[in-house]
Amino acid sequence: MSPAPSRPRIRPWLVVGDLALAAAWVCAGALVKLLVYGGLGLGGRPEAEAVKVSLSLVYMFLFAWLEAASGGASYNPLTVLAAALASHGGPAVYLFTAFARIPAQVIGAVLGVKLIQVTFPNVGKGARLSVGAHHGALAEGLATFMVVMVSVTLKKKEMKSFFMKTWITSIWKNTIHLLSSDITGGIMNPASAFAWAYARGDHTTFDHLLVYWLAPLQATLLGVWAVTFFTKPKKIKEQKVDENKIKKE
């Protein structure tokens, strides 16, 4: 008989890793834009997006490696929330994620934006909502749902190849980002969105909270639930059906 899987443990040191990676993530994204539009002078040219995607793939591989090397630190609140929900870690893990890890990521992202703005004053002000709040919430929520579905599915399948897993998720995230970039910026990261909004001074508006927090958080919950439901072993599904029949009788 195989041993029962161990329940996820609370690892306090991940808070430091979350803060550092969140700061580095916003800096990396801003530096890529500076290089493409400023250093290479590709602003407004078709090849600009191709170069951005190529550079994004490079640093997404780097951050995936950093996440693995740190034992699970992350730059995205949606990633740690999805992991906590999918692992069924219990109230302690959920509370640690909500009140320690996610705030650390937000603080890290804010510090990262401040650092990049001080170093490069012409870095810009981040992505903004270009449509109505409800339209934007639908777009950001749908984009998040699609990314979470793929990420959680790959994790549940326990794909051993780091390269293939990272390649699939990176290509998928970049595709969804491009499709939603003209609507909400395709951020799919509440910490990064908050950091840039904080720098602009519009981080407490209803539109920001709805589009970049409520919609993606709800989409994450729905995505984890959907993957968990559709990837349940057949025996468990049949057992639940039988139990329901017995109750009705």
UniProtKB/Swiss-Prot annotation:
Subcellular location: Membrane
Motif (NPA 2): 189-191
Major localisation: membrane
Keyword Translocase: no
Membrane topology of the entry: Multi-pass membrane protein
Position of sequence motif NPA 1: 76-78
Keyword field: Membrane, Repeat, Transmembrane, Transmembrane helix, Transport
Signal sequence, renumbered to the chain: none
Domain remark from Swiss-Prot or TrEMBL: Aquaporins contain two tandem repeats each containing three membrane-spanning domains and a pore-forming loop with the signature motif Asn-Pro-Ala (NPA).
Cited function: Aquaporins facilitate the transport of water and small neutral solutes across cell membranes.
Name recorded for this polypeptide: Aquaporin SIP2-1
Encoding gene per record: SIP2-1
